[in-house]
Amino acid sequence: MSEERIIEKQVKTFLDIVILAILNGNSMYGYKMIAAIHRDFGILLSPASLYPLLHLLENNKLIESRSDKGKTVYYVTPKGKEKFEKKCTAYKLSIQIMTNFIKTHGET
């Protein structure tokens, strides 16, 4: 599997964390999030990949939306910020465990 494919898989697996990170301190509409992900990771998400997750995050009260000049703008809630911090801690730990595992069993 190529490095690009691994990165794409990781971003899609942890897309909720990526979205909460992008919205942390910024309000943004969906297509701008797609552009930010493309800029930061080189991955072009389809709206069909993004919008169902935005609705799920909104239903779970992790983000909220408002209409602004005909566009839906999303922003993170205090509950979303708390969830983001917890998920980041868990993600960092899992990366550390995986890195140690790879070091122990030999890198190629």
Model regions and ranges:
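N-terminal helix-turn-helix DNA-binding core of bacterial DNA-binding proteins
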Residues: 7-49, 62
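Basic, amphipathic "hinge/linker" alpha-helix immediately C-terminal to the N-terminal HTH DNA-binding motif
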Residues: 69-88
